[in-house]
Amino acid sequence: MRASVAAAFITLVMLVTTMACRHDDLEGIQPDLSRTTPLELDVPSYFPPLNIPADDPLTVEGVALGRRLYYDTLLSHNGPFQGRACASCHDQSRSFTVPGNGTNVLPHVNLAWSTNFLWNGKVSGTLEDILRFEVEDFFQVDVEPLRNHPEYPALFRQALGTNTITRHDVTRALAQWFRRLTSTRSKFDQVKMGQAVFTVQEQLGAMIFFSEAGDCFHCHTSPLMTDNAFHNIGLQSAFSGYDVGRYAITGAPMHMGAFKTPTLRNIALTAPYMHDGRFQSLEEVIDFYSGGVQHSPSLDPIMTKPGTGITLGLTSQQKADLIAFLHTLTDETFVTDPALGSPF
C-alpha cells in the first residue's frame, strides 16, 4: 500500500514538473529559427546601427506575429486592461502615441535605438526589457487564451521556433514588431538624401534649430531627434509627485525634474506636449522655450544662455520659421503605411 502511494506521489510530482516546464517562461531554451525568414530594415546610412540581440533576430514571421499581438485585444484577457490592445491607445495616424488631453505618452517610434524607456527611465536596456515590463507588469498578459487559440500556436511555432507560448515568447515577438516601427522617410530625410529641398522658411527654421539661436540640437540630436537622455528643461521651479521625474528612479538631486528627451520625429502629430501634456500646440511649446523657462537648482546647464539668462527671446517670425522646420519631421509614409496598420 505504501509503495503504491509513493509511486502515485512520484508520478504526480513528475506530472506537475512537466507541466511547469511546459508553461513557464523557459528563457534558457534555444528556439529553432532555421525556418524563419531574416528581415533587414531599410534604414538610411546616416542612422546609428541597430542593436538586435542574437537571441531575438529580426524575421518576417516574428514581425508579423508581433504586429498581430500589438493589435489583438486577446493580449489583455483577464488583465487590468481587459478588452484593449496596444493599438487601442497607440494610434498609427498619431505616430503610435495616445491622442487626447492629459498625461503625454511617448510614441512607439524609433525605440529600436533607445536604451532608456518611459519618461523617467524606469526601465533600461533593450526593447526586450521594456516589453517584458509591458507584458508582465502593465498588461499582465494571460497566455492561456493564446495557447488555446486556433491559430496562435502555429504562428508562434513558425515565428519563434517554439512549441510553447510563454510571456517570454510574447515579449520577443513584440520586440521584433517595435524594431519594425522605424520612421526614416520625412521631408527632413529626403532633403538629407538629396531627394528634396527645404522651402526658404523651412531652411530658416533649420538654421535656428541647429544653432544657438534655438538651442534645440543639443538634446534633439540628428538623425533620431533625441539624445535619449534626461534633462530638467525648466517647466517648473518646485517638484512633487510625478513631476520629480528621473529623481524618482535615481534619487540623485541633479535628476530632480528631469525627463527623457522625446523624439521630434512626427512631433506635429503627437500633441499634447511635455510629460504632463501641459501644452496643446507647437506654438505653446516654442513660446515656453522662448521666454517661459523657470530656474531651479537642477535646471540643465544647456538651458542657460550667456548674456540672456534662460530665455531665447525668439521673434514671432523666428518662431514661425522654427515650426515650419518641425513640420518637415513628419513622416507621412510611416503614419499611413498599411503594413504598419491592423492585420485584422
Show the residue positions of the predicted features.
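Positively charged n-region of N-terminal signal peptides that target proteins for export
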Residues: 1-5
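Bacterial N-terminal signal peptides
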Residues: 7-17
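Periplasmic c-type cytochrome electron-transfer domains
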Residues: 21-344
